A protein has these predicted regions:
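Active-site environment of divalent metal-dependent phosphoester hydrolases
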Residues: 6-11, 33-36, 59-62, 118-119, ...
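Hydrophobic/aromatic beta-strand patches that form the interior of the parallel beta-sheet core
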Residues: 26, 51-53, 110-112, 143, ...
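Active-site-proximal beta-strand elements of phosphoester/diester hydrolases
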Residues: 1-6, 108-115, 160-164
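Acidic, His/Gly-rich catalytic cores of divalent-metal-dependent hydrolytic chemistry
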Residues: 154-220
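Active-site-proximal segments of metal-dependent phosphoesterases and phosphodiesterases across multiple
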Residues: 69-76, 106-137
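Anionic-ligand binding region
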Residues: 124-161
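Short acidic-hydrophobic surface loop/beta-edge motif
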Residues: 98-106, 153-155
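Core catalytic region of metal-dependent phosphoesterases/phosphodiesterases
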Residues: 2-94
Length: 220
């Protein structure tokens, strides 16, 4: 389970190279946004048959602009993405669902970027004050993203999983993803060291502003 790649092909490849014996890859959105390697990321998704939903940044790309209250960094990244993305890959993003209800090994799974109640913008942090709301859902597992903070929490009969980010982790510098053994219902969050400096150097050559790398310095 992965999320919030944000055009970081270096992070995505690091995570994929760590996977062994995996049958499915699920993504909770934000394939695009911030960093410039969006075509490489989308092509990798296609090659690996990743099951994914849209995130808010993916929707900004589809809309051609971010909302007025968003930061200049986000608005600039939308303009950069519009110039970079291929026609085929734009169609791929446009055709992703806002949410998915699927069944895996007789378990009902909801995949959504933000929350079941606000698909794009609500953030379910580890200290979310209203976790009891999840008890009302007729599912076994909710997979979400958006916060860039990993979470594995069981509320009643519902397991809530946020894999963290393999593109822009915000709690520490290590990339984050989650393994789910669907036979035993065991979830494990994993963290990986990656080549931050190499990524920053290459992204800067593509015109990414320095402010988008501050997050990596802030959490060292």
């Amino acid at each position: 389970i992965i999320s919030d790649i944000h055009g970081n092909i270096h992070g995505l490849k690091t995570v994929l190279s760590d996977l062994t014996g995996v049958d499915k890859i699920i993504c909770a959105g934000d394939i695009t946004g911030f960093y410039p390697f969006i075509n490489e990321v989308i092509n990798t998704f296609k090659k690996n048959n990743v099951i994914s939903v849209k995130g808010n940044h993916d929707q900004y790309l589809i809309d051609g602009k971010a909302q007025e209250d968003k930061s200049d960094e986000i608005k600039n990244s939308v303009e950069r993405m519009k110039k970079l993305i291929s026609e085929q890959n734009f169609s791929y993003i446009k055709n992703l669902p806002e949410f998915l209800n699927i069944t895996i090994d007789n378990k009902k799974v909801l995949i959504v970027h933000g929350s079941p109640w606000n698909h794009f913008e609500e953030r379910i942090y580890p200290d979310y004050p209203s976790f009891d709301r999840f008890k009302e859902l007729d599912v076994d597992v909710v997979i979400l993203g958006h916060t860039h903070y990993p979470l594995i929490k069981k509320i009643g009969n519902v397991t809530i999983v946020n894999p963290g980010s393999c593109g822009q982790p915000r709690d520490k510098n290590l990339l984050s993803y989650t393994i789910w053994d669907t036979k035993t219902d065991f979830f494990e969050n994993r963290r990986l060291i990656w080549d931050i400096e190499g990524f920053i150097k290459e992204a800067k050559l593509m015109g990414v502003e320095d402010s988008l790398f501050e997050v990596f310095k802030r959490i060292q």
